[in-house]
Amino acid sequence: MNRDSLLTPNRRGTDSVKWGLYGEDVLALWVADTDFQSPPAVIEALQERVAHGVFGYPLHPQELRELVAARMLERFNWRISPKDMIFIPGVVPGFNLTCQLLTKPGESVLVQPPVYPPILNAAEKTGARNIHVELVRQTDGSYAVDFDALEAAIEEDTRCLIFCNPHNPVGKVYSRQELERLVEICLRHKLTIISDEIHSDLIFKGSQHIPIASLSDEVSKSTVTLIAPSKTFNIAGLSCAVLICTNHELLKKIENTSHGLLGDVNLLGLTAAIAAYRDGSGWLEHMMEVLEGNRDFTFDFIEKRLPQIKMHSPDATYLAWLDCRELALEESPYKFFLKKAKVALNCGDDFGDCGKGFVRLNFGCSRELLTEALEKMEKAIRER
């Protein structure tokens, strides 16, 4: 299997958000889906299901429950039961709904920017309010939690922390020591943890993902974990995610509330998830090799040819968080690179105030496309 065997030749004209939002002359390295074709096992399973020709209301397969439980044990040494989960259309609806159930209007939710924009928006959708406790950028470009600031920010009406691990956009994988300290604070203040772990399959060598709920039975019962095969196997459009909670009283409350609000999981999403989790491990291993090569290529290119941009090599995800503040641009780097380089990135402002002057780059694409985009960015900087 060579690098190019993963790639979709052309996504333009396929109603892709990533490739359809901007003009034909713009290279899309923004929204977090890859340009890689899904695993052959997934495509074959979908073709077989479509050939059946009937697409009525689906049951939630026991096979998928068992596959998820086995996957959590095998990959993360986290023992859960098939009864500890429900299937929902997406991670974002999952944390929005959970936040709604845990808070009343005016109560507060902890978030840690720079972070995935829907996490910043979750509280406002329910009438609650955010308390921002920014991650601290270190001299090497990595990020750390200021635990003293986090605890000091907790108010009497703070109900939960929306946590992101692996972290989007900075690519941080939290250590056991960091997780244990975070958990200690949350348990002491009786905060529920809503943990977005959608990127947990996309871990590079040298790092290890630890589900925060796996630390103890006590924290498990105070945590709602959200995962999905969508980022891993590039099936976001099929709308299937997993919400895990060993507190069955809370899980049942979430499930009951979801009916009529979230809608059901897509039938083909269930089919794809089963095939991906059952038969996609070899494909995933190869994709991670490709992503690691792209990550290292991006880092080396920026270090050598774009020295005014700073990048810390991520521990996980296919996303690079680029500090462009030294460029001293008159406009946001997002607008600059879109107009001058014809490269679409994510605007750092969307990830919180501390994201101003940053962009997020998606390197889940062909090496050729990645090279072309970086060279266009280099040319735009040189000619400004």
Predicted features along the sequence, with ranges:
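N-terminal small-domain helix-loop-helix segment of the aminotransferase-like
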Residues: 1-90, 97, 278, 384
